[in-house]
Swiss-Prot record:
The record marks 178, 239 as: Transition state stabilizer. Keywords: ATP-binding, Cytoplasm, Kinase, Magnesium, Metal-binding, Nucleotide-binding, Transferase. This is Acetate kinase. Pfam families: Acetate_kinase (PF00871). It comes from Streptococcus pyogenes serotype M5 (strain Manfredo). One of its GO terms (cellular component) is cytoplasm.
């Protein structure tokens, strides 16, 4: 038996889950937020308890030290050597990483170089990896890449219709993201449907603060909505999703607050989407509250959100030439029944119909009617478990 930590590190946060492997039992989980800021928050959940501390945590190395000390302090482990592996979620692996890998100096260097593809994510992941390697140098660290699952896309799908030199010289192409989540829920959908994954055509919709839709043909990603970076695709919590690229130079010319392309991209990443259009929040619960109050900006943001998701799902019905099931997952996908209802309401032509009594908050499973030609499933994603499984698989190959 061994204990494995699955890590999802952001620029100012470190989310973690500790597993007993190979039993896949969750022993504890938590998150450290506001790293590098005053009043950092460390939350630990274990044995039905919740412990929260307000601390000053200056960087990821301090965060990792606090995490490990908390595991001992709360009696979750007796010593560091009980931990035999650490798995790290890394958003962008580019073309270099087609599967999960054991970390070494070269791997870490490549992850930092690939930050251009995921500037909001890769730097934090690299900081988390470096911190664990410094503190626990003898423990196997594994990187699990969001992009790996999408490396099965055909060249005509992942290339953009621009001169090919930008791909050959600069590797400009579609990479996708959320691959670990899409892979996991597709596997779970096959179990739920009682059919081999290799026979199924699935559309998986990961709808959280980030949103991505994937066309899954016989267990492989054949197309996905996120692109060169996770900014592409449908409207998201704070991200715009797809826009006409000519808007970028136009805004630089027109708005004195936007001095260069980096300013515009920052606005598209952090100040757009549900938050930017509504002026209220990136949280669907707040948007739905605005709908109840007939707030016109909330209504507009919600309608754009639904419209963009429906279009991608419809597009992937064409890519797959039909589908056996549509899967909703992630924060909104799992917990926003109104959103699911309104998305499906625009897709009934494809043979989808949901049971309103099953399409309620907290329900997991098949929410479609018996007559529905395409099954509609709500499945909780578990990226952390996928990461822990890959650590278990790779830790003896170091």
């Amino acid at each position: 038996m061994s204990k494995t930590i699955a890590i999802n590190a952001g620029s100012s946060s470190l989310k973690w889950q500790l597993y007993q492997m190979p039993e896949e039992e969750v022993l504890a989980q938590g998150i450290i937020e506001r790293i590098g800021l005053k009043d950092s928050i460390s939350t630990v959940k274990y044995d039905g308890k919740k412990e929260e501390q307000i601390l000053d945590i200056h960087d990821h190395t301090e965060a990792v030290k606090i995490l490990l000390n908390d595991l001992i302090h709360f009696g979750i482990i007796a010593a560091y050597d009980e931990i035999t592996g650490v798995g790290h979620r890394v958003v962008a692996g580019g073309e270099l990483f087609k599967e999960s890998v054991v970390v070494n100096d070269k791997v870490l260097e490549h992850i930092e170089e690939l930050s251009v593809l995921a500037p909001l994510h890769n730097p934090g992941a690299a900081a988390g990896i470096r911190a664990f390697r410094d503190i626990l140098p003898d423990i196997t660290s594994v990187c699990v890449f969001d992009t790996s699952f999408h490396t099965s896309m055909a060249k005509h799908t992942y290339l953009y219709p621009i001169p090919q030199k930008y791909y050959t010289d600069y590797k400009v192409r579609k990479y996708g993201a959320h691959g670990t989540s899409h892979k996991y829920v597709a596997q779970e959908a096959a179990k739920m449907l009682g059919r081999p994954l290799e026979e199924l055509k699935l559309i998986t919709a990961h709808i959280g603060n980030g949103v991505s839709i994937t066309a899954n043909y016989h267990g492989k990603s054949v197309d996905t909505s996120m692109g060169f970076t996770p900014l592409a695709g449908p409207m998201m919590g704070t991200r715009s999703g797809d826009i006409d690229p000519a808007i970028i130079p136009y805004l630089i010319e027109q708005d004195p607050e936007l001095k260069d392309a980096a300013d515009v991209v920052n606005m598209l990443n952090k100040k757009s989407g549900l938050s930017g259009v509504s002026g209220i929040s990136s949280d669907m619960r707040d948007i739905e509250a605005g709908l109840q109050e007939d707030n016109p900006d909330a209504v507009l943001a919600y309608n754009i959100f639904i419209d963009r998701i429906k279009k991608y799902i419809g597009q992937y019905f064409a890519v797959l030439n039909g589908a056996d099931a549509l899967v909703f997952t992630a924060g909104m996908g799992e917990n926003a029944p109104l959103m699911r209802q309104d998305v499906i309401g625009g897709l009934t032509w494809f043979g989808m119909d949901i049971d309103p009594e099953k399409n309620v908050f907290g329900y997991r499973g098949d929410i479609s009617t018996p007559e529905s030609k395409v099954k509609v499933l709500v499945i909780s994603t578990d990226e952390e478990l996928c990461i822990a499984r890959d650590v278990e698989r790779l830790k003896n190959t170091k």
